């Protein structure tokens, strides 16, 4: 296999106009690849460290130090290594960093190199990335969990829940699922306009109107599904990312104008699940409310998918704690939360081995990089969260999945309703 000949990096902009890291890798057989790193708005306290420069430049958000770390520290250490030994490349970087949270070199530097090396190795092997990482069994196209209505940290509105998503569960193929989702998205815009509500967009391409309640958001989406000529619960299911850590303070949740305990939040979710075809709730409670998560999982885990994002931060140790303790039944997979491809794949493997579902995810600050689309197929996640069917940094991932589905031909299978406990039988 080809070895790594040169590694370069630069500062580029993400979809929010903030700097991020882009890495380029050249192998000695002239194979070449680049990768760009995403960045989150609502970040878990236990995520790997994203190195930012501070100071006045880019309001303190520059990544010149991370870029310098790639060029001056990481590159000399990995040049000459076999590009197909991903674990060795990643381990070399982790040892160079030497901290538990990648605080020295930065997860943004390490991840950029990790993904670019994988892409270059795939190029050298003359394989698409999903096949290179996932092998011959990588054939499952994910359900697109489309965030079409935004609140919380992703929007300037008075809606507590960060994301209201649609899941096109009734489609026979990914291509048809994408069409269904896009049609509901456009129908929602018309519904909002008709009601005199704002149609401005949040970070991830979803609409961000001011609404009276979180239930009102679900009702609007239900109306849009109907207006698109589709059936709620059959063609389209609903999902939410609550991001509850964002409104948790002093042991209670500041929610819908009052405060709620974990027990009251659980009762609230149970009522929603009984009223709407909700298949998945992400981060329903605070990232350190392990007892609350256990009670909520006991109550709702057999009915719906309960996803740990801030709870697990794609970290095998925190995920193992949840598996042992009975918290959640699914893992949200964000490559930049943990900061290397190897560690990401280890987390997915641990989840799958223990019967936890997985959802591949973007971040709110994205680029045109499509790596996560390939990784969703490579890992047979069956679900991907990469925003609304709008804004090119979101659509880039959907378009890559269309290409993968075409390339797989008859071998392609769309995950559909079987991805979720509510419909899996």
From Swiss-Prot:
Active site positions: 204, 334
Needed cofactors: Mg(2+)
Domain of life per record: Bacteria
Catalytic activity, as annotated: (2R)-2-phosphoglycerate = phosphoenolpyruvate + H2O
SUPFAM superfamilies: Enolase C-terminal domain-like, Enolase N-terminal domain-like
Molecular functions per Gene Ontology: magnesium ion binding; phosphopyruvate hydratase activity
InterPro entries for this protein: Enolase, Enolase-like_C_sf, Enolase-like_N, Enolase_C, Enolase_CS, Enolase_N
Keyword entries, A-Z: Cytoplasm, Glycolysis, Lyase, Magnesium, Metal-binding, Secreted
Coiled-coil region(s): none
Annotated metabolic or biological route of this protein: Carbohydrate degradation; glycolysis; pyruvate from D-glyceraldehyde 3-phosphate: step 4/5
Pfam family, one: Enolase_C
GO biological process, one term: glycolytic process
Positions with a binding annotation for Mg(2+): 241, 282, 309
SMART domains the record matches: Enolase_C, Enolase_N
Function: Catalyzes the reversible conversion of 2-phosphoglycerate (2-PG) into phosphoenolpyruvate (PEP). It is essential for the degradation of carbohydrates via glycolysis.
PANTHER family: ENOLASE (PTHR11902:SF1)
Family matches, as HAMAP family: Enolase
Family note: Belongs to the enolase family.
The protein's name in its UniProt record: Enolase
UniProt organism field: Nocardioides sp. (strain ATCC BAA-499 / JS614)
Gene that encodes it: eno
């Amino acid at each position: 296999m080809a070895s790594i000949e040169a590694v370069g990096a630069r500062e580029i902009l993400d979809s929010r106009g903030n700097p991020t890291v882009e890495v380029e890798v050249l192998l000695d057989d002239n194979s070449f690849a680049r990768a760009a790193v995403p960045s989150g708005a609502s970040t878990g306290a236990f995520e790997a460290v994203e190195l930012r420069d501070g100071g006045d430049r880019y309001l303190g958000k520059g990544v010149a130090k991370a870029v310098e770390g790639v060029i001056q520290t990481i590159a000399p250490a990995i040049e000459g290594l076999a590009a197909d030994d991903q674990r060795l490349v990643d381990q070399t970087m982790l040892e160079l960093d030497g901290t538990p949270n990648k605080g020295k070199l930065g997860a943004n530097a390490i991840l950029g190199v990790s993904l670019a090396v994988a892409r270059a190795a795939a190029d050298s092997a003359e394989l698409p990335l999903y096949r290179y990482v996932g092998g011959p069994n990588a054939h499952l196209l994910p359900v697109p969990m489309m965030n079409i209505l935004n609140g919380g940290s992703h929007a300037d509105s008075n809606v507590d829940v960060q994301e209201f998503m649609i899941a096109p569960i009734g489609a026979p193929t990914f291509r048809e699922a994408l069409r269904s989702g896009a049609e509901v998205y456009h129908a929602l815009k018309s519904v909002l306009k008709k009601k005199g509500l704002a149609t401005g967009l949040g970070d991830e391409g979803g609409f961000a109107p001011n609404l009276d309640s979180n239930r009102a958001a679900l009702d609007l989406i239900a109306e849009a599904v109907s207006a698109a000529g589709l059936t709620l619960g059959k063609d389209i299911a609903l999902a939410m990312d609550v991001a509850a850590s964002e409104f948790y303070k002093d042991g209670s949740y500041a929610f819908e104008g009052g405060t709620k305990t974990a027990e009251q939040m659980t009762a609230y979710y149970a009522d929603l699940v009984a009223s709407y075809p909700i298949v998945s709730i992400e981060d329903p409670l605070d990232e350190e409310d392990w007892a609350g998560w256990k009670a909520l999982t006991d109550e709702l885990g057999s009915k719906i998918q309960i996803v740990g994002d801030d709870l697990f931060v794609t970290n095998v140790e925190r995920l193992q704690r949840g598996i042992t303790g009975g918290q959640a039944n699914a893992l949200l997979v964000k490559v930049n939360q943990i900061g290397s491809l190897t560690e990401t794949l280890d987390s997915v493997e641990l989840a799958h081995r223990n019967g936890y579902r997985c959802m591949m995810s973007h971040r709110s600050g994205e680029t045109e990089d499509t790596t996560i689309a390939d990784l969703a197929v490579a890992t047979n996640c069956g679900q991907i969260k990469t925003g609304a069917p709008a804004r090119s940094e979101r659509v880039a991932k959907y378009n890559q999945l269309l290409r993968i589905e075409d390339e797989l031909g008859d071998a392609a299978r769309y995950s559909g309703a079987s991805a979720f406990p509510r419909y899996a039988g």
